[in-house]
């Protein structure tokens, strides 16, 4: 089916001015920051195998912060900006902004956001929020950078006229507008909205960072590179716009599926679940359109930019259907918090988005006059990256399934850690081809044959006159529909934030007022300092602080979290991953001496623990804690204290005030209303088989007991 497909043919013999300097600058910055971010990721992954390896480096959590922000803002941000400087003049027929504004944006993005942001998080100044780790001063600069990008790239489209825009233009406009709207929501709002209510806004940003920033710009690249490389129009302009509006209407509704079975109201969770399944259908439309647009190019296209774009489309289909599957409540119960989710995120950012980013940079770079490009190096990089990322994602997916199986049972937590070790080793090994692939792409841009002015920008310019002629037959009603849809899109974004952020906050506030046993217990100065240490070291990336409403969580960690428990948490630290156990009920479960020994040398207490040690918080031994260690201990001892003090009167009051006990997060006595710091009874211990021998008993002792008992 072809409807107005002539709009979608970015090939002609003329081109408006393209600022090659800014294309090159952002391209080189993209790969430089990518390699640094990958280095952080490798160091983070190696600690799963060698927990004491990075003692001379910043802590695991700090490097994890630097890794995620480096991938999203450093690598993808710069790659997308490089592509925009090339594509916007072609798509709009007008140059993008000004050279001076572009240089200011480049300096702001890299020398005021990325470098200071990395220095700050590695120095301990950060936010414990997923995809929002840079501290507030840097967040303000990021918002300013996005505003400058909008000023730089949006006016050419406005002057061009909405009714004649190609779909890549729409994705670019949508990304710039909606990222400006959503970034403050996930990076600023949780600092002022506590607990689960703040987590609702974080959940929206976790998904919008990918869905309204990364995905639209990646799809803009794919819809540009595919027809420019094949010399054919896209299969269907109608399907491309259907996919565009489906994405922007549904993505903002997905965020709360990151908190299924949490204390966030079930209505918000159900909305996100339904939207997640519908989004899967939209993705199938987008992917079908892009795949059919490549017909005749072969399974492995000869054009290297098209080859990366083609694999990006495949990754996009897999990761999107995987996301819809994860929204299923039964499946989420099994895999949430596991490495299955980490594999999913790597497939999104290092698979789909990264391959699209490479395709965009390569396509733009080879069209610039006097640019070098090593096609042999790019060919090797393609295969190394494809194999490496595939192995990494498959490995993490299997690890997540194994972890989920252990967590659903009654096996000790450490059993899941031991079972995960082989998968963590493979994950680190898979970083070798991935890193080599990225190095080769960077090398390819700096070596090889040079292009000439005659085969530079002219070879891929959009046929703007032809495109305009193709759209002059559109009816006034259809032209008006673009404007109506644009206004509706912004309105629907506001509606989604209200539905999944504002209304849940109000509901949680009402529940807190009705169910809280009394005024909130304020943290002491030492506990506040300890909370800051917990946040800066990234403890919430290993330990959640939410006991979900699942049988497995209740059996393992005790009574589920209630709305009022997080009413003083600014920002929340519910967490989105469990490498270690949940800590929401830590108070009074361990002795002071145990905690201090565990902080100083985790493996002296739990022999097979992979938790990082914090000897810098001590004066040379576990019995000589410095103030940081005592403050962190004070905070750990505060977790769950208020709930423990309120039991059982607080839960009885909750039952009296509501009929729908589970919906309002209250509990039933004896079945669920256990002491909140205690787990459910598990029955008699299984008898050892008659064939058990001394060697087996010794291994059990060594793995589980020797740390404390010598």
Which residues does each PLM region occupy?
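Extramembrane terminal tails and long inter-domain/linker segments of multi-pass membrane proteins
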Residues: 1-23, 403-421, 448-488, 508-518, ...
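Hydrophobic cores of alpha-helical transmembrane segments in multi-pass integral membrane proteins
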Residues: 24-49, 60-92, 99-123, 136-155, ...
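Non-cytosolic membrane-interface motifs at loop->transmembrane helix junctions
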Residues: 128-139, 164-168, 197-207, 264-275, ...
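C-terminal capping alpha-helices of c-type cytochrome domains
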Residues: 150, 489-503, 592-680
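Hydrophobic, small-residue-rich membrane helices and short re-entrant helix-turn-helix hairpins
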Residues: 161-166, 198-202, 229-240, 267, ...
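C-type cytochrome heme c attachment motif
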Residues: 211, 532-544, 567, 581-600, ...
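Electrostatic cytochrome c docking/interface patches
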Residues: 509-535, 547-554, 646-648, 658-700
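Membrane-embedded segments
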Residues: 546-579, 607, 618
């Amino acid at each position: 089916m072809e409807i107005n497909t002539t709009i979608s043919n970015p090939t002609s013999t003329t081109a408006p001015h393209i600022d090659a300097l800014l294309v090159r600058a952002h391209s080189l910055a993209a790969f430089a920051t990518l390699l640094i971010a990958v280095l952080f990721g490798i160091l983070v992954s190696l600690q799963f195998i060698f927990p004491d390896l990075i003692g001379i480096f910043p802590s695991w959590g700090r490097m994890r912060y630097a890794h995620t922000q480096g991938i999203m803002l450093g690598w993808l941000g710069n790659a997308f900006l490089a592509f925009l400087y090339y594509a916007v003049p072609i798509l709009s027929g007008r140059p993008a902004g000004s050279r001076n504004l572009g240089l200011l944006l480049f300096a702001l993005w890299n020398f005021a956001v990325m470098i200071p942001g990395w220095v700050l998080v590695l120095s301990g100044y950060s936010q414990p929020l997923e995809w929002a780790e840079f501290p507030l001063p840097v967040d303000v600069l990021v918002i300013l950078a996005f505003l400058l990008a909008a000023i730089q790239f949006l006016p050419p489209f406005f002057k061009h006229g909405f009714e004649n825009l190609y779909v890549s233009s729409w994705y670019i406009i949508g990304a710039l507008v909606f990222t400006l709207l959503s970034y403050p929501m996930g990076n600023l709002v949780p600092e002022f909205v506590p607990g689960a209510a703040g987590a609702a806004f974080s959940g929206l940003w976790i998904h919008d960072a990918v869905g309204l920033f990364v995905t639209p710009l990646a799809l803009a690249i794919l819809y540009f590179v595919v027809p420019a490389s094949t010399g054919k129009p896209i299969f269907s302009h109608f399907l491309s716009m259907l996919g565009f509006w489906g994405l922007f209407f549904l993505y903002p509704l997905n965020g709360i599926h990151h908190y299924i079975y949490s204390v966030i109201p079930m209505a918000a969770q159900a909305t996100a679940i339904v939207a997640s399944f519908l989004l899967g259908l939209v993705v199938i439309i987008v992917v079908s359109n892009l795949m059919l647009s490549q017909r005749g190019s072969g399974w492995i296209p000869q054009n290297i930019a098209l080859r990366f774009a083609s694999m990006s489309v495949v990754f996009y289909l897999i990761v999107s259907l995987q996301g819809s599957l994860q929204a299923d409540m039964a499946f989420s119960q099994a895999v949430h918090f596991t490495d299955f989710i980490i594999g999913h995120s790597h497939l999104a950012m290092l698979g789909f988005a990264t391959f699209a980013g490479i395709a965009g940079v390569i396509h733009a770079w080879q069209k610039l006059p006097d640019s070098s490009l090593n096609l042999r190096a790019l060919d090797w990089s393609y295969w190394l990256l494809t194999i490496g990322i595939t192995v990494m994602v498959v490995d993490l997916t299997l690890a997540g399934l194994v972890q989920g199986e252990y967590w659903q049972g009654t096996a000790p937590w450490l059993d899941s850690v031991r079972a995960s070790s082989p998968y963590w080793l493979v994950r680190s090994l898979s970083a070798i081809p991935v890193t080599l692939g990225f190095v080769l792409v960077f090398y390819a841009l700096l070596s090889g044959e040079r292009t000439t002015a005659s085969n530079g920008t002219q070879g891929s310019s959009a046929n703007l006159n032809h495109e305009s002629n193709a759209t002059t037959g559109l009816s006034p009603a259809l032209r008006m529909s673009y404007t109506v849809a644009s206004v509706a899109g912004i309105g629907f974004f506001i509606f989604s934030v209200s539905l999944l952020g504002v209304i849940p906050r109000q509901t949680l506030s009402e529940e807190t007022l009705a169910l809280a046993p009394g005024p909130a217990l304020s943290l002491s100065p030492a506990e506040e300092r300890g909370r800051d240490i917990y946040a800066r070291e990234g403890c919430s990336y290993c330990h959640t602080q939410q006991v979900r409403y699942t049988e497995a969580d209740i059996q393992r960690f005790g009574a589920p979290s209630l709305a009022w428990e997080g009413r003083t948490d600014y920002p929340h630290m519910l967490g989105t991953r469990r490498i270690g156990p949940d800590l929401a009920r830590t108070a009074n479960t361990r002795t002071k001496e145990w905690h201090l020994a565990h902080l100083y040398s985790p493996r002296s207490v739990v022999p097979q623990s992979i938790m990082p040690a914090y000897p810098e918080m001590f004066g040379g031994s576990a019995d000589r804690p410095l103030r940081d260690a005592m403050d962190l201990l004070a905070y750990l001892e505060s977790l769950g204290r208020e709930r423990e003090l309120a039991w059982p009167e607080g839960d009885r009051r909750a039952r009296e005030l509501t009929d729908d006990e589970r919906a309002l997060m209250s509990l039933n006595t004896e079945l669920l209303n256990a002491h909140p710091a205690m787990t459910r009874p598990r029955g008699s211990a299984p008898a050892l088989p008659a064939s058990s021998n001394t060697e087996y008993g010794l291994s059990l002792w060594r793995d589980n007991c020797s740390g404390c008992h010598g």
